[in-house]
């Protein structure tokens, strides 16, 4: 199974979704004062969407900092995005932005804490990504 790296806000929706996956996961620190996370294996990034539909503010700052490290960026295999369908076309926008910029697939979008079906789909994606990367 592919590694999981995730970012979660204080609301904790993304963290709760990742916990339901029941896989080892590393969390991107929220604070600049925390030691930065550096990955050494291919991973799938799971993140929430910020903002009000503006692609410039959809990706959380800590995720941008994490991906600005070329070592971290080189190992990303795909993206899973959380969001809220109340935001219409902006639902999961952060995932689309990161997938486009990193040239990796957007594997799935889930609402709030996700459903059992979302969990099953993401588990399948993680297993597939691990097969693809070796």
Curated annotation (Swiss-Prot):
This is Protein NrdI. PANTHER family: PROTEIN NRDI. GO terms for molecular function: FMN binding. GO terms for biological process: protein modification process. InterPro entries: Flavoprotein-like_sf, RNR_Ib_NrdI_bac, RNR_NrdI. Belongs to the NrdI family. It comes from the Bacteria. Pfam families: Flavodoxin_NdrI. Probably involved in ribonucleotide reductase function. It comes from Chromohalobacter salexigens (strain ATCC BAA-138 / DSM 3043 / CIP 106854 / NCIMB 13768 / 1H11).
């Amino acid at each position: 199974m592919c590694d999981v790296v995730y970012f979660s806000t204080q609301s904790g929706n993304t963290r709760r979704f990742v916990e339901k996956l029941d896989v080892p996961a590393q969390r991107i620190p929220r604070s600049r004062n925390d030691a930065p996370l550096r990955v050494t294996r291919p991973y799938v990034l799971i993140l929430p969407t910020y903002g009000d539909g503006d692609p410039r503010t959809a990706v959380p700052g800590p995720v941008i900092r994490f991906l600005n490290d070329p070592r971290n960026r080189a190992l990303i295999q795909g993206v899973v995005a959380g969001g809220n369908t109340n935001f219409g076309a902006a639902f999961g926008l952060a995932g689309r932005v990161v997938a486009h910029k990193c040239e990796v697939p957007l594997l799935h979008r889930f609402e709030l804490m996700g459903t059992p079906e979302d969990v099953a789909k993401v588990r399948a994606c993680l297993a597939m990504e691990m097969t693809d990367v070796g």
